[in-house]
Amino acid sequence: MLKLFILKLFLFLFLFSSNCFAEWKKITDSENVEIFLNFKEIKKNNDLIFFWQLNNYVKPLREKIFSIKIYIKVDCKKNKFNPLIFSYHVEPMGSGEADIKNNEQTKWILVKSKSKHKLILKTACIASFRT
């Protein structure tokens, strides 16, 4: 229970301080979204990597959401991922008021070839081996 509290506290503090220190690099975009990664914050733990992704929307999503930060766990060898935390923001680039949600589903998602997820995860996995 204490570990869970400490983890949530750490993530809360990180989410609200991350914009000041984050170095978001644009990976891809489409009609309504730009997708960024924070390469400086990629963490490795055995065969898994953990990183933050930022989706910045040109037109707001539901409830005036202009950006979403997602903390993602990836198994680079097995080509699968699990989004752990979603942070919904009312301003662009992960700024402004945030609504933080833990992902209740713990199922891994297999990456489809030729998808944006494939590009994002491949980029993060390659970057993790350089650090």
Q: What name fits each language-model region?
A:
Residues 20-70, 75-131:
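N-terminal secretory-pathway/extracellular module detecting exported/lumenal segments
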Residues 8-17:
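Bacterial N-terminal signal peptides
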Residues 1-7:
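Bacterial N-terminal signal peptides that target proteins for export
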